[in-house]
Swiss-Prot record:
GO terms for biological process: DNA damage response. It is a single-pass membrane protein. The keyword Magnesium does not apply. The keyword Isomerase does not apply. This is Uncharacterized protein DinQ. It is found in: Cell inner membrane. Induction: Repressed by LexA, induced by DNA damage. The chain crosses the membrane at residues 6-26. It comes from Escherichia coli (strain K12). It comes from the Bacteria. Its main location: membrane. One of its GO terms (cellular component) is plasma membrane. Belongs to the DinQ family. The lineage of its organism: Bacteria, Pseudomonadati, Pseudomonadota, Gammaproteobacteria, Enterobacterales.
Amino acid sequence: MIDKAIIVLGALIALLELIRFLLQLLN
């Protein structure tokens, strides 16, 4: 359970970083 939560959290953070990167490219 804990391992899964860490993986999900890591994936969400990676997604947010990717979105921020894409937004910077567009601006």
